[in-house]
């Protein structure tokens, strides 16, 4: 018996059911890589950030997440080069879905019990997504805005339900507004740290502040 179609598991009906010592024998999720492209690019290299935002409360299978990741990556590599972007899948499939296997061969009624003992065996994993939750983000250079929108539009076709594409006002994957970011870095209130930044608050030891601004 093959994999049941994902439309059977689209809606969030039950409580979250993660892999645990009580729920064993769960097959591995199809998606294993969540960051691709130029992951180690400094925070100031990729100021533009685009998000794919869910418009429904639903479940997305790990197969769909993997398909969307491959689709977006393929388009971005073709249009921006393999070092011109950084994609991050923001969902992780932790919810385990079950299947109560039914036999369909001749004489099956003697072998199986129908709906008696109908609690199924683990079949795969899905990610539960809320309205307004980000599914996937891409950061890149400002001139690649159209390519980001097109890559996310193509990836949208891999998912059920509705998604929106949103170009963020923040700088890259940080939580700081793009129009204030460079000023805050110049004032040393933000210190670049990989693909993120460290925020230096205006309180604390004075000698530490002097050492930073010397």
Curated annotation (Swiss-Prot):
<keyword id="KW-0225">Disease variant</keyword>
<feature type="cross-link" description="Glycyl lysine isopeptide (Lys-Gly) (interchain with G-Cter in SUMO2)">
    <location>
        <position position="175"/>
    </location>
</feature>
<dbReference type="GO" id="GO:0005829">
    <property type="term" value="C:cytosol"/>
</dbReference>
<comment type="subunit">
    <text>Component of the large ribosomal subunit. Mature ribosomes consist of a small (40S) and a large (60S) subunit. The 40S subunit contains about 33 different proteins and 1 molecule of RNA (18S). The 60S subunit contains about 49 different proteins and 3 molecules of RNA (28S, 5.8S and 5S).</text>
</comment>
<dbReference type="GO" id="GO:0016020">
    <property type="term" value="C:membrane"/>
</dbReference>
<keyword id="KW-1268">Autism spectrum disorder</keyword>
<dbReference type="InterPro" id="IPR001197">
    <property type="entry name" value="Ribosomal_uL16_euk_arch"/>
</dbReference>
<dbReference type="GO" id="GO:0032991">
    <property type="term" value="C:protein-containing complex"/>
</dbReference>
<feature type="cross-link" description="Glycyl lysine isopeptide (Lys-Gly) (interchain with G-Cter in ubiquitin)">
    <location>
        <position position="188"/>
    </location>
</feature>
<keyword id="KW-0687">Ribonucleoprotein</keyword>
<dbReference type="GO" id="GO:0043066">
    <property type="term" value="P:negative regulation of apoptotic process"/>
</dbReference>
<dbReference type="GO" id="GO:0022625">
    <property type="term" value="C:cytosolic large ribosomal subunit"/>
</dbReference>
<keyword id="KW-0963">Cytoplasm</keyword>
<keyword id="KW-0991">Intellectual disability</keyword>
<dbReference type="GO" id="GO:0000122">
    <property type="term" value="P:negative regulation of transcription by RNA polymerase II"/>
</dbReference>
<dbReference type="GO" id="GO:0005783">
    <property type="term" value="C:endoplasmic reticulum"/>
</dbReference>
<keyword id="KW-0689">Ribosomal protein</keyword>
<dbReference type="GO" id="GO:0003735">
    <property type="term" value="F:structural constituent of ribosome"/>
</dbReference>
<dbReference type="GO" id="GO:0045182">
    <property type="term" value="F:translation regulator activity"/>
</dbReference>
<protein>
    <recommendedName>
        <fullName>Large ribosomal subunit protein uL16</fullName>
    </recommendedName>
</protein>
<dbReference type="InterPro" id="IPR016180">
    <property type="entry name" value="Ribosomal_uL16_dom"/>
</dbReference>
<comment type="function">
    <text>Component of the large ribosomal subunit. Plays a role in the formation of actively translating ribosomes. May play a role in the embryonic brain development.</text>
</comment>
<dbReference type="InterPro" id="IPR018255">
    <property type="entry name" value="Ribosomal_uL16_CS_euk_arc"/>
</dbReference>
<keyword id="KW-1017">Isopeptide bond</keyword>
<dbReference type="GO" id="GO:0022626">
    <property type="term" value="C:cytosolic ribosome"/>
</dbReference>
<dbReference type="GO" id="GO:0003723">
    <property type="term" value="F:RNA binding"/>
</dbReference>
<dbReference type="GO" id="GO:1990403">
    <property type="term" value="P:embryonic brain development"/>
</dbReference>
<keyword id="KW-0217">Developmental protein</keyword>
<dbReference type="GO" id="GO:0006412">
    <property type="term" value="P:translation"/>
</dbReference>
<comment type="similarity">
    <text>Belongs to the universal ribosomal protein uL16 family.</text>
</comment>
<keyword id="KW-0832">Ubl conjugation</keyword>
<dbReference type="Pfam" id="PF00252">
    <property type="entry name" value="Ribosomal_L16"/>
</dbReference>
<dbReference type="InterPro" id="IPR047873">
    <property type="entry name" value="Ribosomal_uL16"/>
</dbReference>
<keyword id="KW-0164">Citrullination</keyword>
<dbReference type="InterPro" id="IPR036920">
    <property type="entry name" value="Ribosomal_uL16_sf"/>
</dbReference>
<dbReference type="GO" id="GO:0005634">
    <property type="term" value="C:nucleus"/>
</dbReference>
<dbReference type="GO" id="GO:0002181">
    <property type="term" value="P:cytoplasmic translation"/>
</dbReference>
<dbReference type="GO" id="GO:0006417">
    <property type="term" value="P:regulation of translation"/>
</dbReference>
<feature type="modified residue" description="Citrulline">
    <location>
        <position position="32"/>
    </location>
</feature>
<keyword id="KW-1269">Autism</keyword>
